[in-house]
């Protein structure tokens, strides 16, 4: 009996047929699997978006109210706050947890929000948080105008958010976009500093010491790397990196208010940003105190007619205690619900870092220009007509902050530990209103560590600037930016007493 089997020809034919079948079926199976993964990924993203919608309902007060404004919710925040089950939300193509963000965009034409999942989380600046008596404005047609529900800022295009305080908010509050806000009605201008994290290149890929990105010249530093973040993001990196890939991001101290005084970074103590006065604080040039040149003789703490505008006389000769108390009382004069206060050095540093970035005065990572100097010898804010002095702006255009370089030395609410008790206060101010430095060594001045984002040791000597830290008991305060009588830059700092002729101050507001 013969054994039956395949001949070689038959075997080759069968293998050929199987190969043809495989060529047909494998792509079909691969495509089917890919479609299944794409469907599963889409479903996972929908789960994330639904969780974001629930989150948004619980935090509705933080959502944007102007057309095109974007609120970013991190997927990690949804996990941390139990809106998502970490084990179930995975990328089916990698079997790893899905990260990224949900962008919540306000669409005014529909009166609702658009939710989109994205893998990128650092594209948009946090929406400005306004006090109910602050009026958002946009600069168009050579004037400040109401915004209605339209988009009014774009940090990616160096257009910073501006708001004003007017004598009568009801006159403008419900107007459509495009109505001029008269200068005579404005008493104060403010600029929004959105929350960000930063890192500074210390050495390039060639191992050379650098000052900002890829600059070996301390007199011409490169950009500071910045990414905008949400309030839930707390980056605790070193704030510097080696090589050409930014890493080790750090959230500046300015975006944290330790209300509990426990040195714990509680989520409820984080800020999505803060407002800084667009100009130094001033009086009308013909005010009796400005004319006499002796503000110390004025009851300035309760004085009306204090402005944060250009072409005003910067308030000087006042002394720290009066500056501090004037700043606190200014919010009452402006009918604000949120407290005004004297700017801290940490806030000055944050504004300076934003300026030294692609969102400020840098046209590329290796090409940044120093903030122009207000050299008005009469200490006039904005150098006079600020519209003609745009080089003095923190971002090179009219939406930025002025008087950071020149004008007056700006006294900050920042002191050496134990000194504030000796400044004449009957009761010490709340600790969130000042920086308490613990050492005369600026590299160890924040609890034996670097003061992150304060523009002290991290940017020492940039643009060839003068720098003197808090050195001794007789000169234990800290001023920034130089005045119109010297050639210091915005990066300059100087130890100071509490009553100096060329010291003024700037107002800050943190709206919760």
Language-model-detected regions and their locations in the chain:
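N-terminal single-pass transmembrane signal-anchor helix
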Residues: 2-30
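C-terminal, surface-exposed recognition/capping segments
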Residues: 346-349, 380-382, 386-398, 404-512
């Amino acid at each position: 009996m013969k054994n039956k089997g395949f001949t070689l020809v038959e075997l080759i034919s069968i293998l050929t047929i199987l190969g043809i079948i495989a060529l047909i079926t494998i792509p079909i199976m691969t495509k089917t699997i890919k479609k299944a993964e794409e469907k599963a990924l889409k479903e996972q993203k929908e789960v994330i978006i639904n969780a974001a919608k629930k989150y948004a309902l619980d935090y509705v007060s933080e959502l944007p109210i102007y057309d095109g404004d974007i609120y970013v919710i991190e997927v990690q925040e949804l996990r941390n706050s139990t809106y998502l089950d970490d084990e179930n939300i995975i990328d089916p193509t990698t079997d790893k947890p899905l990260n990224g963000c949900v962008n919540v965009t306000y669409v005014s034409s529909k009166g609702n929000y658009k939710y989109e999942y994205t893998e990128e989380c650092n594209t948009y600046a946090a929406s400005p948080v306004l006090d109910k008596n602050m009026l958002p404005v946009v600069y168009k047609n050579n004037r400040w105008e109401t915004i209605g529900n339209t988009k009014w800022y774009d940090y990616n295009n160096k257009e910073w958010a501006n708001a004003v305080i007017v004598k009568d908010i009801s006159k403008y509050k419900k107007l459509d976009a495009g109505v001029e806000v008269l200068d005579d009605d404005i008493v104060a201008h403010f600029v929004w500093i959105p929350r960000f994290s930063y890192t500074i290149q210390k050495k390039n890929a060639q191992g050379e010491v650098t000052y900002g990105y890829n600059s070996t010249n301390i007199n011409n530093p490169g950009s500071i790397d910045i990414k905008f973040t949400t309030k839930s993001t707390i980056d605790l990196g070193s704030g510097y990196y080696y090589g050409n890939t930014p890493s080790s991001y750090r959230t500046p101290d300015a975006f944290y208010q330790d209300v509990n005084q426990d040195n714990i970074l509680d989520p409820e103590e984080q800020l999505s940003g803060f407002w800084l006065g667009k100009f130094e604080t001033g009086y009308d040039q013909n005010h009796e105190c400005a004319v006499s040149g002796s503000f110390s003789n004025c009851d300035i703490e309760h004085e009306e007619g204090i402005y944060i505008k250009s072409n005003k006389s910067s308030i000087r000769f006042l002394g720290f205690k009066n500056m501090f108390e004037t700043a606190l009382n200014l919010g009452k004069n402006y009918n604000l619900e949120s407290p005004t206060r004297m700017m801290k050095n940490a806030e000055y540093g944050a504004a300076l870092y934003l300026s030294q970035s692609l969102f400020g005065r840098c046209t590329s990572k290796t090409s940044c220009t120093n903030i122009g100097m207000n050299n008005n010898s009469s200490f006039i804010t904005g150098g006079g007509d600020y519209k003609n002095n745009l080089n003095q702006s923190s971002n090179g255009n009219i939406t930025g902050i002025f008087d950071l370089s020149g004008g007056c030395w700006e006294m900050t609410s920042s002191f050496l530990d134990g000194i504030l008790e000796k400044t004449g206060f009957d009761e010490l101010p709340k600790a969130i209103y000042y920086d308490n430095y613990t050492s005369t060594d600026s590299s160890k001045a924040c609890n034996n560590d670097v003061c992150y984002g304060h523009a002290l040791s991290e940017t020492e000597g940039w643009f060839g600037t003068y720098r003197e830290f808090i050195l001794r008991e007789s000169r234990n305060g800290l001023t920034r930016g130089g005045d119109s009588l010297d050639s210091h830059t915005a990066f300059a700092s100087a130890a100071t007493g509490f009553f100096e002729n060329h010291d003024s101050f700037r107002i800050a507001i943190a709206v919760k």
